[in-house]
């Protein structure tokens, strides 16, 4: 793994593109991260056999920030308005209200939002929303990675289902 060591004062930002994908929502899903810094690239993806698209979008963002071992200036690009609005508009109010919505309900995916909030404290993050499937190269790479994760999750879920049928 490449070490992306640099100071947060460095003017060259780490560029991160994230995406999540889910089949049947909830169902098998995947997340993808495309990271570039100077002349280095990193592509990572993962999966979950029972999840939602929003959880995969958040997981992609969390896993991307976990890749950074030091404090960075980060430009983070997502095609998820849920992530974009949540982190730039809603999260401060959620924290003030003890992670409850205005209806006194616990924020959906609170576990992931809390983790994401903790991770961003280490970095200087600029959040950018990009339209999905609009030709943005970084987003297209992240989308393909998320789809790979989703396909793996679908295969695992199918094998588990077949195993259950076999054992019954």
Swiss-Prot record:
Essential cofactor(s): Mg(2+)
EC nos: 3.1.26.4
GO cellular component: cytoplasm
Family (UniProt): Belongs to the RNase H family.
GO biological process terms held by the UniProt record: DNA replication, removal of RNA primer
Described purpose of this protein according to its UniProt entry: Endonuclease that specifically degrades the RNA of RNA-DNA hybrids.
Domain of life: Bacteria
Free-text cofactor note: Binds 1 Mg(2+) ion per subunit. May bind a second metal ion at a regulatory site, or after substrate binding.
Main location: cytoplasm
Positions of Mg(2+) 2 binding: 19, 143
Name used for this protein in its record: Ribonuclease H
Subunit structure: Monomer.
Binding locations of Mg(2+) 1: 19, 57, 79
Gene responsible for this protein: rnhA
Catalyzed reactions: Endonucleolytic cleavage to 5'-phosphomonoester
Location of the RNase H type-1 domain: 10-151
Taxonomic path: Bacteria, Pseudomonadati, Pseudomonadota, Alphaproteobacteria, Rickettsiales
Naturally occurring in which organism (per UniProt): Orientia tsutsugamushi (strain Boryong)
Keywords: Cytoplasm, Endonuclease, Hydrolase, Magnesium, Metal-binding, Nuclease
GO molecular function: magnesium ion binding; nucleic acid binding; RNA-DNA hybrid ribonuclease activity
Cellular compartments annotated: Cytoplasm
